[in-house]
Amino acid sequence: MSDIEERVKKIIIEQLGVKEEEVKSEASFVDDLGADSLDTVELVMALEEEFDTEIPDEEAEKITTVQSAIDYVNAHKDA
């Protein structure tokens, strides 16, 4: 597991109050991890803070699964 993947999963666990084993790559924040719209906004804010980046709203709407969050950070970490 990459450092970024570990950091993203740690944020998801902290923000959503879920168990580590529930945080699978394909897990949907809403459908699988029980997040609501406020949870997803807070999750995006935590990702922005952790990775010192700004995620535009139109991009944030596409971050709906654990893997999509990891992919977004990987794609934008050097931007």
UniProtKB/Swiss-Prot annotation:
Compartments in which it is found: Cytoplasm
A molecular function (GO) term: acyl carrier activity
PROSITE patterns: CARRIER (PS50075), PHOSPHOPANTETHEINE (PS00012)
Domain of life: Bacteria
GO biological process, one term: lipid A biosynthetic process
A Pfam family reported for this protein in Swiss-Prot or TrEMBL: PP-binding
Keyword presence, Mitochondrion: no
GO CC annotations, alphabetized: cytosol; membrane
Similarity comment text for this entry: Belongs to the acyl carrier protein (ACP) family.
Main location: cytoplasm
InterPro entries: ACP, ACP-like_sf, PP-bd_ACP, Ppantetheine_attach_site
PANTHER family xrefs: ACYL CARRIER PROTEIN, CARRIER DOMAIN-CONTAINING PROTEIN
Role according to the record: Carrier of the growing fatty acid chain in fatty acid biosynthesis.
UniProt keyword list: Cytoplasm, Fatty acid biosynthesis, Fatty acid metabolism, Lipid biosynthesis, Lipid metabolism, Phosphopantetheine, Phosphoprotein
In-chain residues carrying the UniProt-annotated modification O-(pantetheine 4'-phosphoryl)serine: 37
PTM comment, free text: 4'-phosphopantetheine is transferred from CoA to a specific serine of apo-ACP by AcpS. This modification is essential for activity because fatty acids are bound in thioester linkage to the sulfhydryl of the prosthetic group.
Keyword flag Cytoplasm: yes
Name of the protein: Acyl carrier protein
Domain Carrier: 2-77
The protein's annotated pathway: Lipid metabolism; fatty acid biosynthesis
